[in-house]
């Protein structure tokens, strides 16, 4: 019985050693693959965006429709970057300057729920900066995510 246990222990130790060697080899392969991936990623250039980066918005009412179209178009072609309403609103906020930037500060300070609701945020912007929706605009926004 003792001899059998010694043989079993010896077999287990041999298996352990073989697995340790295999594990070391796999770790080395993983390290090489990570390095190769990094090298390949440095060589890849992301495709250029067909829609230019939107201009900033300073609160000038006549520019609000243009601003909304520019930002919506940009977010549409870069949809992987704008996966939820909070990201969309944050993007819009990053482009606000002047009076428009001053307008949004209280919403940020009170961590308003509107910061996570893209459509509600647009509606508030339209109310504040004087753009009245007609029925056609409302139907268009109901069809789109932007």
Curated annotation (Swiss-Prot):
Q: Which UniProt keywords apply?
A: Nucleus
List GO terms (cellular component aspect).
nucleus
The subcellular localization recorded is: Nucleus
Query: GO terms for biological process?
Result: cellular response to lipopolysaccharide; cellular response to muramyl dipeptide
Relate the protein's function as given in its record.
May have an important role in the development and/or progression of some cancers.
Q: What binding partners and quaternary form does the record give? A: Interacts with NOD2.
Q: What family does the Swiss-Prot or TrEMBL record give for this protein? A: Belongs to the LDOC1 family.
The name on file for this protein is Protein LDOC1
């Amino acid at each position: 019985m003792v001899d059998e246990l010694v043989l079993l222990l010896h077999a287990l130790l041999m298996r352990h050693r073989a697995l340790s060697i295999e594990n070391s080899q796999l770790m080395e392969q993983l390290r090489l693959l990570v390095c190769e991936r990094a090298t390949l990623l440095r060589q890849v250039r992301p495709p250029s965006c067909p829609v230019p980066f939107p201009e900033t918005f300073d609160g000038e009412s006549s520019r609000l429709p243009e601003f909304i179209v520019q930002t919506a178009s940009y977010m549409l072609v870069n949809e992987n970057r704008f996966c939820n309403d909070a990201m969309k609103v944050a993007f819009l906020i990053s482009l606000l300057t002047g009076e428009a930037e001053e307008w949004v500060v209280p919403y940020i300070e009170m961590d308003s729920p509107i910061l996570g609701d893209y459509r509600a945020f647009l509606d508030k912007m339209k109310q504040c900066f004087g753009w009245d929706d007609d029925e056609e605009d409302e139907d268009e926004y109901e069809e789109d995510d932007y």
